[in-house]
Amino acid sequence: MNIILNILNQFLKKGRSIVILKKIVRRFSKNNFDKNQYKNWLDSNKSSLDKFLKKINHRLFIETKKESLKINDYANNRLKNIKVKLGGGANDMLLYFFVRYFKPKVVLETGVAAGFSSLSILKALKKNKYGKLYSSDFPYFRIKNPENYIGILVDKKKFPNWELKIEGDEVNIPKLISNINHIDIFHYDSDKTYKGKINVYNLIKKKISNKSILIFDDVQDDKFFYEICQSSNLQYKIFKFKSKYIGVLGKIKSNEI
């Protein structure tokens, strides 16, 4: 009953009903592909993230490991008394390392939840003393007052270089990128459906180039990542993270990705 009331409350807020309906329709849309065959492709192309990062820059890898421990200890302590589920954290090591290594001017991410990915990116940007993070999210409409939990791990006073919008990707992204010339690093971790990923990719593709690094979480859910790999000239890398897979598109060094 509480879930229904929470959904209704969010549904009645301006602009939220259309986003919620689209999410529900996409969630129940059929996703026709051979999951076993696709998993075999992922497994045959996956790499060890630790080995990959060490090969690029061993000293930075050590720094990243230390920061990852700090981030996860802080997050676990911050979230242990919260009684709602806010979704799993992203691969903070990959995000922190890439931001430190590339020193991007612009990072765009979709999917914030508690803010694991946001905090990792922002800490790396702060270490770089350069760059801004633009984040897109939509409240978990099944819980009460979901806006209060978005980015709860991030102390906004410490990170003035963070711009967050919470009206859904289709509304947020055009606003976020309107004054951006180029997206240096893009991290996708929002709508898990094929249609949702295609929509976001179409929104950002004019702002990316072969110099951009694109990171997609949960690529095992559909063939979106595979199709992008096949249709673009970008090199790719796949990493297993817990029970899921992360896909990376872009060029780091010719012999490393």
Predicted segments, located by residue:
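Membrane-proximal basic amphipathic "stem/tether" segments
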Residues: M1-R59
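Short, flexible coil/linker elements and helix-boundary hinge sites characteristic
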Residues: L12-V19, K30, N57, N77, ...
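Polar helix-capping/helix-linker motif
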Residues: K13-K14, K54-R59, K66-I71, K156, ...
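Generic hydrophobic, helix-prone segments enriched in Leu/Val/Ile
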Residues: L21-K22, L60-L79, I173, I177, ...
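Short charge-dense sequence patches
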Residues: Q37-D50, K65-A75, G111, N148-D155, ...
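Class I SAM-dependent transferase core
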Residues: K46-N91, F97-F102
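S-adenosylmethionine/decaboxylated-SAM
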Residues: N81-L86, D92-I257
